[in-house]
A protein has these predicted regions:
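ATP-dependent carboxylate-amine ligase catalytic core
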Residues: 1-71, 89, 95, 118
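Short intrinsically disordered, low-complexity coil segments enriched in acidic
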Residues: 1-8, 150-153, 184
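Hydrophobic/aromatic residues in well-formed alpha-helices
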Residues: 16, 181-182
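Acidic, Mg2+-coordinating active-site environments of NTP-dependent enzymes
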Residues: 48-58, 73-74, 78-181
Length: 184
């Protein structure tokens, strides 16, 4: 349930049970993973809650990720690419970056954290191929976010916060007129 929140509040257990039972009763005709069920549950819950915006995190990668079924996002984010999930995503940083870059859609915008040179080249090539705009997280963006209270520990979380803030500013910037603290 901590994976699904609306306005900072976790989905109630009753809704997890109700939506989980609803989804388990459907014959999708394919084998779904736990991530697939959680994604479907989140989408149903967000629809019920009439969310204006959703932040959806991919599972392992990008290219073959279940989240691609949602369609073209207003903005995608690629965080720092490392060597995790090498058995699934690839044996070197360029292969892993190619998988992660699979979330870049035609004529879209993607916020990208600072990357290894090889990873960034792959991301830039994919963005160019898809006519996508890249917004790069800079040190000044990270510094601006350093005063935020984050729920997770680790210095890399400041980079993630900066990427999330840039994505929010991009998406909301077109329509947003509320107070600055709401973006934070």
């Amino acid at each position: 349930e901590e994976r699904i929140t609306v306005d900072g509040r976790m989905i109630p257990k009753e809704d997890v049970t109700r939506l989980g039972n609803y989804l388990l009763d459907i014959d999708f005709g394919i084998g779904l993973t736990m991530f697939d069920y959680c994604l479907a549950m989140a989408l149903l819950y967000f629809e019920e809650q009439q969310c204006d915006y959703m932040v959806i995190e991919t599972g392992l990668g990008g290219r073959l990720d279940s989240t691609n079924a949602i369609g073209t996002p207003q903005c995608a984010v690629i965080t720092k690419i490392g060597y995790d999930h090498m058995a699934i995503l690839g044996s070197d940083i360029a292969d892993i970056a190619a998988e992660k870059a699979g979330i870049i859609k035609e004529n879209s915008t993607v916020v990208v954290e600072q990357q290894d040179k090889r990873a960034m080249q792959v991301i830039e090539q994919e963005a160019q191929k898809r006519h996508a705009r890249i917004i790069t997280v800079e040190q000044s963006d990270i510094a601006r976010c350093s005063g935020y209270a984050l729920r997770l520990c680790g210095t890399f979380q400041w980079e993630n916060a900066a990427a999330a803030e840039l994505a929010a500013r991009y998406v909301l910037g077109k329509h947003y007129s509320g107070p600055e603290y709401e973006i934070q």
